[in-house]
């Protein structure tokens, strides 16, 4: 996340996630001042969407006007689509094709080879 923020020359805020069990996650954010801004949440995997929805609600409560989420691997199981309605848009790579697929990892893999 900090690399992306550095490349884009934008501020970064890291939220801490602690997994209590297979279905329960506790998210802490500290002070979030995003009033009037566009926020982007980055995560490696979105499964049920619970963590992203919690983070998006924290950002909305902090005054973010728009909230986007992006991930590498989008599973989007159970009621994820409903939970993620708090976000303005969701972007996922093509590692798992789906309704939120917006970008390909193929160029990065080809470059690495």
What are these regions (language model features)?
Residues 1-113:
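PRPP-associated nucleotide enzymes
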């Amino acid at each position: 996340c900090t690399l992306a923020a550095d490349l884009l020359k934008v501020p970064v805020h890291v939220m801490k996630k602690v997994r209590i069990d297979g279905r329960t996650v506790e998210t802490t954010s500290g002070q979030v001042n995003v009033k009037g801004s566009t926020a982007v949440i980055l995560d490696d995997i979105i499964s049920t969407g619970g963590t992203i929805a919690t983070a998006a609600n924290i950002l909305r409560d902090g005054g973010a006007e728009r909230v986007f989420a992006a991930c590498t691997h989008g599973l989007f199981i159970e009621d994820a689509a409903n939970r993620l309605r708090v976000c303005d848009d969701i972007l996922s790579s093509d590692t798992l094709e789906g309704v939120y697929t917006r970008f390909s990892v193929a160029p990065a893999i080809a470059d690495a080879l």
